[in-house]
Swiss-Prot record:
Name of the featured protein: Ribosome-binding factor A
Similarity remark: Belongs to the RbfA family.
SUPFAM superfamilies xrefs: Ribosome-binding factor A, RbfA (SSF89919)
Keyword Lipid metabolism: no
Gene Ontology CC entries for this record: cytosol
Pfam families, sorted: RBFA (PF02033)
Known function: One of several proteins that assist in the late maturation steps of the functional core of the 30S ribosomal subunit. Associates with free 30S ribosomal subunits (but not with 30S subunits that are part of 70S ribosomes or polysomes). Required for efficient processing of 16S rRNA. May interact with the 5'-terminal helix region of 16S rRNA.
SUBUNIT field: Monomer. Binds 30S ribosomal subunits, but not 50S ribosomal subunits or 70S ribosomes.
HAMAP family associated with the record: RbfA
Basic and acidic residues: bias regions: 116-135
Amino acid sequence: MSKEFSRTQRVSQQLQKELAMILQREVRDSRLGMVTISDVEVSRDLAYAKVFVTFLCVGEQTPESCLAALREHEVHIRMMLGKRIRLRLTPEIRFYYDNTLVEGMRMSNLVSEVVNEDKRKQQDSGREEDQAGEE
């Protein structure tokens, strides 16, 4: 009987849940805005965790400035995480900006532009055929 989830996947899910709670309730930094954890990748030995985040930036905030502010809290967040989870070693946390949402929107816009361009060309060629048929 095989396991449905590997240990790294279970730890990854637990880390994502706990990190979301920590960021929401315990990290007080106005530079962060609203932080969403989109994914957590844990190394096989559970020593390292890549945390992918997105931000809802307000006003002067940029994703880069929010990420820099979040990275200042890495050590403190790891300490709080160590108190909440039962692992022999608390993973070293590294935060990365997750731009998949931005890239997805960009790709969607490109597809929409191509479809609209194609429709316009079809309409133009249809008008040319109508004009040729009238003559």
